[in-house]
Structures are given as structure tokens and as C-alpha cells.
Amino acid sequence: MSTVVVKGNVNGGVQQPRRRRRQSLRRRANRVQPVVMVTAPGQPRRRRRRRGGNRRSRRTGVPRGRGSSETFVFTKDNLMGNSQGSFTFGPSLSDCPAFKDGILKAYHEYKITSILLQFVSEASSTSSGSIAYELDPHCKVSSLQSYVNQFQIPQGGAKTYQARMINGVEWHDSSEDQCRILWKGNGKSSDTAGSFRVTIRVALQNPK
């Protein structure tokens, strides 16, 4: 008895699964693979800053090349308990040659915008008395007339004047004084009182 093996396209035959696998492979090969484009994240756009018309005025109060702003410090030493005197701020300020004989002569106009008056005590703890001081914003007074404001000689103290108090809002000709501070002590002539330390801020314009 012989055995016959039939190879054909009979449904349910042995070759049917292989043909399906080949067809499946062909379909996969014919499929178009999608291409994914990956782009790097872009740089954030920079917003252009708008320049204001008064940018220079925000940077500095005085236009470059037309004016200047300076600070000066000077002292009045060896004050006794009964010393008296005055500071005249402007071309008459002999206690500050760097201002009077220096930069003030290089400009036509100036204005002192602040004054810091400090009394530094050098007195002993047993000393007594005080130093009265007065602001004259228009240089009309030649001697102390008010004793309301005082520095206690053993303690010292400080007083700040802003522009509106010292006639420092408007510009002044460099040949005229702006304001004056007068002072007078009521202590003993034999007692050492201390010294004044004065700081002024000055704006200048219209160079010569």
C-alpha cells in the first residue's frame, strides 16, 4: 500500500498558513512609514525695549557736558563754649576753599541742594551749655536772632536742610551767596566745646 501526499491549494491544506504569512509580510513592507519631524524648541523672541524721550534725564539730573553735581565737606574746629560765627554759603564760604575758589569759579550758575550741619562734641561730661543755630535763607541777618534750635555741648547733634528750606530750588549766579547759618554758644570761654562738620551738595550749570 502506498501513501500519496497531495500538494495543492486545497483549503485547510498545509501550505495555507505560509501563504497568509507571506501576504501579511508584503502588506507590512508596502506600508509607508510615517516620518516624524522633530524640531528644536525655538528661542524666545526678545521684545524690543522702547526708549523714552527722557532717558537721559532718568540717568542723571544734569545733562552731560552742560553741568555737574558735587559734594563738599569742611570743618570748623577748636570751638569753645562761648564761640559764635556763621557760614555763608556761596562765594563767601571761606571755610571751604575747594568750593569757593575752585569749582564755583568754573560755572556761571549754582544751587546748593542740601546742607548737613553736624556738631561733634569734644567736651567733657561735666561741661554744660549749648550752641544755638539759625538758618537765614536769604542772607539778610548778620547776627543770631533765634535760640529755638540748639546743640547741647556735651552731646552734639545734627541738622539737615533740604533745597526748599535753603533757597536751593532756583539757580543762583556764581557771584552771589545763597543762604547763611548763624550760631552762638552760651558756655564757658575756658571749656572746649567741639567742632562743626558741614556737608553740602551742589549742582552747577553753564560752565565758563
Curated annotation (Swiss-Prot):
Start-end of Basic residues biased regions: 17-30, 44-61
GO cellular component, one term: T=3 icosahedral viral capsid
Signal peptide (from-to): none
A GO term for molecular function: structural molecule activity
Superkingdom of the source species: Viruses
Function field: Major capsid protein that self-assembles to form an icosahedral capsid with a T=3 symmetry, about 23 nm in diameter, and consisting of 180 capsid proteins monomers. Most of the 180 monomers are the major capsid protein, but a small percentage contain the minor capsid protein, which has a long C-terminal extension.
Family, as annotated: Belongs to the luteoviruses capsid protein family.
Protein name: Major capsid protein
Species of the source: Potato leafroll virus (strain Potato/Netherlands/Wageningen/1989) (PLrV)
Biological classification of the source: Viruses, Riboviria, Orthornavirae, Pisuviricota, Pisoniviricetes
